[in-house]
């Protein structure tokens, strides 16, 4: 609904991405609240999914729900990419797509006793920065968990059509990550993969295969 209001006003915005990663966000937040040692900041390498962070801010009592009606409006603070200096509910500004993993590694170096969660995407994983960050995480056994929305959709189309042979899981496995793959809309599978990742001290990727915006008519 938040993204729909913006579109109706001609402000644009993204619906599929933030809608996709609601299940894994709820699972991680619940595990953290239940006492699992997960760093409390929210890192999303796909900043255009900012709508979810704003909704999460409301749920966590850090923002009034009325503000959601002004998503992407100038001066509202609810920018298309999240900016922490504009809203208290935003932990981290990820910049453009695919540029968060290196920063997340830094957080992992500074917080070795907690798991550091990064929400990723198949599109972001095509960026070269991620390859460098993955190798650094493996070399230092950083306790990072990349939960990746793999919906086979990017702004350029479907990766399976224009980048033959590219596979997120195989790529990360080749770089040394432990990889779990699940149906992102099978919540039992998703929960199991996330909890397994948290039992491992070191870099793990959970690849969530799904259709973008499940249940939303095209």
What are these model-predicted stretches?
Residues 3-4, 8-140:
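Cofactor-binding active-site loop characterized by glycine-rich and histidine/acidic residues
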Residues 34-35, 83-218:
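Glycine-rich ThDP/TPP pyrophosphate-binding loop and its adjacent helix/strand module
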């Amino acid at each position: 609904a938040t993204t729909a209001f913006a579109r109706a006003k001609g402000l644009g915005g993204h619906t599929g991405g933030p809608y996709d990663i609601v299940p894994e966000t709820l699972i991680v937040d619940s595990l953290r609240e239940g006492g699992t040692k997960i760093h409390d900041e929210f890192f999303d390498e796909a900043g255009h999914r900012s709508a979810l962070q704003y909704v999460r801010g409301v749920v966590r009592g850090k923002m009034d729900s009325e503000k959601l009606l002004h998503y992407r409006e100038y001066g509202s603070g609810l920018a298309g990419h999240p900016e922490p200096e504009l809203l208290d509910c935003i932990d981290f500004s990820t910049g453009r797509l695919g540029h968060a993993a290196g920063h997340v590694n830094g957080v992992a170096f500074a917080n070795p006793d907690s798991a550091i969660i990064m929400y990723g995407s198949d599109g972001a994983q095509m960026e070269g920065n991620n390859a460098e960050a993955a190798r650094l995480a493996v070399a230092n056994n950083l306790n990072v968990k990349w939960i990746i929305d793999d919906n086979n959709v990017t702004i350029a189309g479907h990766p399976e059509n224009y980048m033959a042979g590219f596979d997120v899981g195989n790529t990360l496995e080749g770089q040394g990550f432990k990889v779990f793959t699940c149906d992102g809309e099978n919540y039992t599978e998703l929960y199991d993969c996330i909890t397994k990742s948290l039992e491992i001290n070191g870099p793990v990727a959970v690849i969530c295969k799904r259709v973008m915006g499940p249940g939303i008519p095209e």
